[in-house]
Swiss-Prot record:
Binding-site residues, ATP: 10-15, 39, 180-181
Essential cofactor(s): [4Fe-4S] cluster
GO biological process, one term: photosynthesis, dark reaction
Annotated binding of Mg(2+), by residue: 14
Pathway(s): Porphyrin-containing compound metabolism; chlorophyll biosynthesis (light-independent)
Official protein name in the record: Light-independent protochlorophyllide reductase iron-sulfur ATP-binding protein
Protein family (similarity comment): Belongs to the NifH/BchL/ChlL family.
Family annotation (SUPFAM superfamilies): P-loop containing nucleoside triphosphate hydrolases
Pfam family, one: Fer4_NifH
Gene name of the record: chlL
Enzyme class: oxidoreductase
Amino acid sequence: MKLAVYGKGGIGKSTTSCNISVALAKRGKKVLQIGCDPKHDSTFTLTGFLIPTIIDTLQEKDYHYEDVWAEDVIYKGYGGVDCVEAGGPPAGAGCGGYVVGETVKLLKELNAFDEYDVILFDVLGDVVCGGFAAPLNYADYCMIVTDNGFDALFAANRIAASVREKARTHPLRLAGLIGNRTAKRDLIEKYVDAVPMPILEVLPLIEDIRVSRVKGKTLFEMAESDPSLNYVCDYYLNIADQILANPEGVVPKDAADRDLFSLLSDFYLNPQQPKTAEEELDLMMV
């Protein structure tokens, strides 16, 4: 099974991806997480350090693919999750999407794709150009990380459009949305009413999720010394269980940008007023 995780930049995709990878491993699956971001920090919370990238390794080998071995580019992370970072070109030069393609090419030559039960692509930001949409060409499911805000849902809608486009050529499905560190879910639900898709999970505003990123640890590793965090791990285990159940998923019908802008803007400009005590009493008497 191959998964691709997308979402607005800074929304918490890498933290979410790492914890989902560990959750899948705890369900007995052999997991490979591939970071597809020039920052090459996707797997930081799994390994505790910034691992060398595939591009770094290829440069050292003068791009002789035959001289690269699996142990040169695949690093063992927490919970037995294997980790790869694609890396990227120097800032302001080259195409990061091309690097993603080269990463997939190398891993295929190393037969890495055949050794894992689950491969998870953690893809940068909300960039959905052809290059960074490349992981969708290999994925069975896409998951979109969002919060209860305007910008994240606007980005989610653009990603949904990419899923719809890629689904024309192979059996890709959108598994659903993951709400990350959000105190409310009303705007998420308003979006889903307009653009039907599953909500896999909504994680509350838990400070330890943010702290885990700084510590370079998954919530599962933190919970080993602080069992009070086990309830946070359950959110990720729930997502893993849903994915392993091979959900039907959807081919999303994204909203037009202007329609979505109006829908989400209206939520802020014309908020629903809470019912008064008298109105609540009237409802109870009906």
